Amino acid sequence: MKRINLTRYLIEEQREHNTIPAELRLLLEVVARACKAISHSVNKGALAGVLGSAGTGNVQGETQQKLDVIANEVLLEANEYGGNLAAMASEEMESFYEIPHRYPKGEYLLLFDPLDGSSNIDVNVSIGTIFSVLHMPKAGEAVTEADFMQPGSKQVAAGYAVYGPQTTLVLTVGNGVHMFTLDREVGSFVLTHRDVKIPVDTKEFAINMSNMRHWAPPVRRYIDECLAGTEGPRGKDFNMRWIASMVADVHRILTRGGIFMYPWDKREPGKAGKLRLMYEANPMAFLVEQAGGAATNGEQRILDIQPEKLHQRVAVVLGSKNEVDRVTQYHLEAKQTP
């Protein structure tokens, strides 16, 4: 069997579809190398003294783990000098990071959640890195936060690396979703799943059931119907899955189908949701749609949302298309009910 590594895949995609110019290819290769370095630190765990809290907080008001800080630094250092980027933005940093003047600047913007699911680090559950690539609107000019304010439909690439039993890089450049597994013996990501597709129907849902009392009625309605099983209106039994790591939950959905929900709840009614639009929802929505699924905030396609700020939050419903459409329909029906 012919082994295709990430570099070869990117070169052949450019030849066939003209979607990956050299600068974007180099950027994606650097991100992949950074993910390899993060994977190495994650795998060492307690042996390298990288578990536990860093004793600091991020802009989200969350306690940073040591590996959060390490992963953020790895991505910044790996990408700042290559000449492919104008700026970067991270879930862990309050403002964007403009490429220092001593380095050449490129035409892309990189956004990332350096270590998603970090509450799972110390208990050895799968975590990951999520990233999104945008064009710099005004190449050659000074970067402002407004340059990042592009809807998810403008992404030129998105992906994640999941650090589990294997380290897997999942990538889209707008021409389907492809998975690459890290071969540690040779140190390269090898194409192992081409053109991944999410089944349109499912019997699995992923949601934090402990928050049920705080949900809006459309979400309660959907979950109640799932829990009713064969005796309820859906006429089939559902299983619940919840890992508390978006990367791990979405990876399962890309692999075998399902629906992932992190809805608005009434504990913080002024916030549209919990997950970050730019670092989590947009790249995952791009991947899910490219795999034949759907992604909404309950009412609107996530990729159509116009961002207003870098750390904007959003409700997320994504996965198997028919289930996402049903949840969206319930939200729209609730709005129309007097």
From Swiss-Prot:
GO terms for cellular component: cytosol. InterPro entries: FBPase_C_dom, FBPase_class-1, FBPase_N, FBPtase. It holds the Pfam family FBPase. Pathway: Carbohydrate biosynthesis; gluconeogenesis. Keywords: Carbohydrate metabolism, Cytoplasm, Hydrolase, Magnesium, Metal-binding. Mg(2+) 1 binds at residues 91, 113, 115. Substrate binds at residues 116-119, 208, 274. It catalyses: beta-D-fructose 1,6-bisphosphate + H2O = beta-D-fructose 6-phosphate + phosphate. Its main location: cytoplasm. Its cofactor is Mg(2+). Mg(2+) 2 binds at residues 113, 116, 280. It comes from the Bacteria. Its EC number is 3.1.3.11. It is found in: Cytoplasm. Binds 2 magnesium ions per subunit. GO terms for biological process: fructose 1,6-bisphosphate metabolic process; fructose 6-phosphate metabolic process; fructose metabolic process; gluconeogenesis; sucrose biosynthetic process. GO terms for molecular function: fructose 1,6-bisphosphate 1-phosphatase activity; magnesium ion binding. NCBIfam families: PRK09293.1-1, PRK09293.1-3, PRK09293.1-4. HAMAP family: FBPase_class1. Belongs to the FBPase class 1 family. Homotetramer. This is Fructose-1,6-bisphosphatase class 1.
